[in-house]
Amino acid sequence: MNVTPEVKSRGMKFAEEQLLKHGWTQGKGLGRKENGITQALRVTLKQDTHGVGHDPAKEFTNHWWNELFNKTAANLVVETGQDGVQIRSLSKETTRYNHPKPNLLYQKFVKMATLTSGGEKPNKDLESCSDDDNQGSKSPKILTDEMLLQACEGRTAHKAARLGITMKAKLARLEAQEQAFLARLKGQDPGAPQLQSESKPPKKKKKKRRQKEEEEATASERNDADEKHPEHAEQNIRKSKKKKRRHQEGKVSDEREGTTKGNEKEDAAGTSGLGELNSREQTNQSLRKGKKKKRWHHEEEKMGVLEEGGKGKEAAGSVRTEEVESRAYADPCSRRKKRQQQEEEDLNLEDRGEETVLGGGTREAESRACSDGRSRKSKKKRQQHQEEEDILDVRDEKDGGAREAESRAHTGSSSRGKRKRQQHPKKERAGVSTVQKAKKKQKKRD
């Protein structure tokens, strides 16, 4: 038969190695006399419903009849006498111990006396017990310090005193403190000098007391004055309320200023470049608005002059209209040139502003956002300028065609010239209406 070797766990191997180091060999028991266990304890899993310590094989190993026979045989005693052999069984009473049951009457209460018609009869047992207790419970003697020193042969807990180092000064100081304390309790002045053990009250408490006293004094004075003059009392109440409000507002403003100052210090370096650009943009916008207003005024004045010329006399008006038409024909060219120059200047200013932001600005994200907004605005403005220029170009072309037709027909007949002169102010009025519409659109966009 092949015996399978035992599979040892890591813990068992480690324990065997430690025991082998100390001279243990397999088969020996543990302990100094080597009479201990020879095999290691092993943990077994409990996979049944029986209690701890239950032996399921006890039914087959327990021979109860054998035990019963042995017990009865042990109780039998065989005695041999003159009469013969006698068998006697031991009584059960001898094997038991007599334990008297406690009296459950008056378990937690003590019977002091019994009531009768004649009176109370005290319990004698209790009296005897109380006498014994009084005799036995004598108060022990209280030893004095001198008696303790004699009993301990002059030895104390202070070991240095054995060498002659005593604490006479400290003991004297403690005695003086005790005497002063006792005198203070009795209300007498101590004869011995007191140590300055009590700490002086702090100055803060004194200040608070003074402030409270002053406030109470002022309050009492106000009450007296209020009783005498109730009108002044109402005024004082209003003033005090106003002062409180101002004080609270001042606190709130100080807190806000503190927070804003901290934020301003942090953002000062980054917003310096942006502030300069904003100021420049504002100045540029104001200049542009002024220039636009001047242009519109000039155009309205010129259109009004043309209308007045058409309404005047026909003979003198023919010469004036030709002069005005020649001027108006020259004006669009000059206007275009001026607008182109202004747009170029605006673009140059915007390019410079963007360069300064990119060069000196500390916060790139903010500068980019600002530049994007400006580029959008500039694009919108350019589109508006282009639309206005297109409108003016159309007008100028119409005016130019009308002028050529008028110049050709002026030599032919005066009637044709009159009709054209009557039609010309209508066209001018239509141009004025378109200009006004463009103005309204710009205002709505702004």
Swiss-Prot record:
Protein's name according to its UniProt entry: G patch domain-containing protein 4
Any Pfam family the entry gives: G-patch
Modified residues (N-acetylmethionine): M1
UniProtKB keywords: Acetylation, Coiled coil, Isopeptide bond, Phosphoprotein, Ubl conjugation
Keyword Ubl conjugation tagged: yes
MF GO annotations: RNA binding
Biased composition (Basic residues): 238-248, 416-427, 437-446
InterPro entries: G_patch_dom, PINX1
Annotated region (Disordered), positions in chain: 116-140, 188-446
A Gene Ontology cellular-component term: nucleolus
Organism listed in the record: Homo sapiens (Human)
Coiled coil region boundaries: 166-251
Chain residue numbers at which the record places covalent cross-link Glycyl lysine isopeptide (Lys-Gly) (interchain with G-Cter in SUMO2): K46
Modified residues (Phosphothreonine): T4, T116
Domain of life: Eukaryota
Name of the gene encoding the protein in the UniProt record: GPATCH4
